[in-house]
Curated annotation (Swiss-Prot):
Gene3D superfamilies reported for this sequence: VC0467-like (3.40.1740.10)
Similarity comment: Belongs to the UPF0301 (AlgH) family.
Disulphide connectivity of cysteines: none
Coiled-coil annotated spans: none
A GO term from the CC aspect: cytosol
PANTHER family xref list: UNCHARACTERIZED PROTEIN YQGE, UPF0301 PROTEIN YQGE
Taxonomic superkingdom: Bacteria
Protein name: UPF0301 protein Noc_0368
Length: 187
């Protein structure tokens, strides 16, 4: 009997040879993975809009300047009009999925209202869109060496500057990406 290995609460780190415009040099935080597929949020691709600009589109007003200047990330190529909030601590929100011991992902508006009122989680990453894989698709891409996987670390998500997250996530797996070849092979 074959036992499946799921990657919930893991980072997917794009290998240097991955040249897909949606995923080159990305770190994707896997929020859900089961027999039906996988879903994650890219954590190192900021968009050219701030939280304040995004909130104006959904009619949330009175955003304090320090909150409004937060970057919004491109979470992935699927449903880019849909918002996702990765946060620590998990807290109690209408639609929160616990990803690990420290991190939740929420899609309900109540968390945005709380953030703008200074009552939200102290650490957040706000994204539009998500990355998704169908049944066995992610496993196939891993077998093809498109990705490096390692258990996620919330410090990389919330405390590491986004420009350094690709290298920092790989370092968790003991990999220096600058030393990898762009050639793909199997031993």
């Amino acid at each position: 009997m074959k036992t499946m290995c799921y990657f919930r609460n893991h980072f997917l780190i794009a290998m240097p040879a991955l040249d897909d415009v949606n995923f080159a040099r990305t770190v994707t935080f896997i929020c859900e993975h089961n027999q039906d597929g996988a879903m994650g949020i890219i954590i190192n691709r900021p968009l050219s809009i701030t939280l304040d600009q995004m909130l104006q589109h959904i009619k949330v007003k009175d955003c304090p300047q320090e909150v409004g200047e937060m970057p919004v990330f491109l979470g992935g190529p699927i449903q880019q009009e849909r918002g996702f909030v990765l946060h620590r601590p998990i807290g109690q929100w209408e639609t929160t999925l616990r990803v690990g011991d420290e991190v939740g992902i929420t899609t309900s508006r109540d968390i945005l209202d709380a953030i703008t009122q200074g009552k939200g989680p102290p650490q957040t990453l706000i994204a539009l869109g998500y990355a998704g894989w169908g049944p066995n698709q992610l496993e196939q891409e891993l077998a093809e060496n498109a990705w490096l996987s390692t258990p996620a670390n919330s410090t990389v998500v919330f405390d590491t500057p986004y420009q350094q997250r690709w290298e920092a996530a790989a370092a968790l797996a003991g990999v220096d990406l600058s030393r990898l070849s762009g050639e793909i092979g199997h031993a």
